[in-house]
Structures are given as structure tokens and as C-alpha cells.
A protein has these predicted regions:
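Short secondary-structure boundary segments
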Residues: 36, 108, 182, 240-241, ...
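A short acidic, glycine-rich active-site loop
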Residues: 51-61
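Structural beta-alpha unit
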Residues: 70-104, 205-256, 260, 264
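Short beta-strand elements of ligand-binding domains
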Residues: 106-107, 134-139, 266-270
Length: 271
């Protein structure tokens, strides 16, 4: 049975992301773990102990309310909940000590809070510190059957392919088409190594509907944006690596292009 963590701070945005995740991954053969974290404010020792107990009680209460709401929406869903001390990333890490986790689902706060998202939100904390696939669902995203997914690719050598399993499963279960996109600065012919990596990608997705595409643009973020808009992409997958599209996206100054890309659900894969 797949174990999927649903991160929540009890906000409407988090609830929306949870609903999106359950509709995407389904209820058959899946156990969802709703995770909430709490950290006491800075204060004297006595106040901290008292506040810590209060926060824990409020967290547990919130989880019970959320579980009840979700079981009404999805009657056959398998749910567990965890209320733990620490940042949400550390809480997820604690859960993985006892559970083999397939994926994490978290919400992002949309355009009004994009700067906080890029510069150090809980979602980014999860991506940077938890070595698990993460589905990031933008504020207000409603789930619809997915027909087209893009994978922002580079020519980095991949030793193994197991980390691609969530992407492969989504493409297969949604009967979607995968478009693997490389952004090129010029119309140069691929060298032998690049051609070899393209062939490897083709073989990885051999049983699925897929296409390897090129986008000509001097800026990788603008190139990905142009590609996703032109092809009506509904989900963007990326591999969390340094010095790649992923790194540029999450460390770039806030731009109009980034605000547009933030409207797509992201599937962040950890190699």
C-alpha cells in the first residue's frame, strides 16, 4: 500500500491541496497520513511548556476535524494523522523513520505570497530537506483529469530511474501524455552524450505516450513558461538538482514569468 503524506497547517489552501492529492492518487491501495507540525514561540520556560501543551492539543483537535471532513468527502479513504513538534520538514522526516513514504503533498500560497514561497516557505523547506517526491499544489487549483504533463529535463546523467515512479504512475493512471522538454539557447546539434541521454529518457517512458521536445530560448524559465502555455500543460515535473532549471527557478529573483509558472502544480522528484 502506498503511503502519502498530506502536509497541513489547517488553512484553506492546505485543505485544497489535500483534496487535489486524494483525487489525483485515488483511494485504492493508498494510505494517507495527514501531518501537522507545531513549534512553541520564544518565551520563558514555564510559558513554553504551557504553550507547547496548548499547541499540541489544538493540533490534534484540528487533525480530528480535518479527518472527519475528508471521510465525508471521500468515504472509503484510508487516513491516519500525526501531530509532531518541529518544522513541517522535520516532522515529515520523523514519519519516514517509521513509514516507507511514496510521496508528499503540500500547498503553495499563490501569487500574493510568491516571494515567501520562493525565499523560504514551508513548501520550499520540504523540497530542500526531505528526500521524497513532493507534489506542490497552487492555491485555488481544482483537480481535473490530467491530459498533458511536462518534464523539464536536462542532459544530466541518470544512474537509476526508480525516483521517476510517481511521474510514471501519474502518466499511466491518468492516461496522460508526457512531454519531455529541453530548453536550448541555440540550434546546435546534440553531442553524443546528449543524444545518449535523450535515448535513455525515451526508453524510460517507452510504454507511455511521450514526446521529447526542444524549446529555443536564452532563458530557461521563460522557455519552460512558453512551452507550458503553448502546449496547455496541466502539471510540471522537475528533478531537484543544483545548477538546473529547478535551481534557477527557486533561486531566481521574482519575475512575471515565475508568477505564471507558479499557477501550475509541480511534481518535484528527488534523484
Amino acid at each position: 500500500m502506498k503511503k502519502i503524506i498530506l502536509a497541513t497547517d489547517f488553512s484553506r489552501n492546505a485543505k485544497n491541496a489535500i483534496e487535489y492529492g486524494i483525487q489525483l492518487f485515488g483511494i485504492q491501495g493508498v494510505n494517507y497520513i495527514i501531518a501537522n507540525s507545531f513549534v512553541e514561540p520564544k518565551a520563558t520556560t514555564n510559558v513554553v511548556v504551557s504553550m507547547n501543551d496548548l499547541l499540541r492539543k489544538e493540533s490534534i483537535k484540528g487533525l480530528k476535524v480535518l479527518e472527519h471532513s475528508l471521510t465525508e468527502q471521500f468515504p472509503s479513504v484510508s487516513l491516519d494523522s500525526r501531530s509532531l513538534y518541529g518544522s513541517i520538514a522535520s516532522v515529515i522526516e520523523q514519519i519516514t523513520l517509521d513509514e516507507k513514504v511514496y510521496c508528499v503533498v503540500a500547498g503553495t500560497k499563490g501569487l500574493s505570497a510568491l516571494e515567501r514561497f520562493v525565499m523560504g516557505s514551508s513548501a520550499l523547506d520540504i523540497i530542500k530537506n526531505v528526500k521524497l517526491p513532493v507534489l506542490l499544489v497552487p492555491e485555488g487549483s481544482a483537480f481535473h483529469s490530467i491530459e498533458r504533463v511536462a518534464l523539464a529535463a536536462d542532459y544530466h546523467h541518470m544512474e537509476q530511474v526508480q525516483f521517476l515512479s510517481p511521474l510514471i504512475d501519474i502518466i499511466s493512471e491518468q492516461d496522460a501524455e508526457l512531454k519531455i522538454v529541453h530548453v536550448h539557447k541555440s540550434n546546435e546539434t546534440l553531442n553524443d552524450d546528449e543524444a545518449s541521454e535523450d535515448m535513455k529518457l525515451h526508453n524510460m517512458f517507452l510504454t507511455l505516450k511521450h514526446e521529447i521536445c526542444s524549446e529555443l530560448n536564452t532563458d530557461v524559465v521563460r522557455g519552460i513558461l512558453a512551452f507550458t502555455e503553448r502546449n496547455e500543460i496541466q502539471m510540471l515535473a522537475m528533478i531537484a538538482r543544483k545548477h538546473t532549471f529547478f535551481d534557477r527557478l527557486f533561486h531566481k529573483s521574482i519575475t512575471k514569468e515565475m508568477t505564471k509558472l507558479s499557477r501550475l502544480p509541480y511534481l518535484v522528484l528527488q534523484e
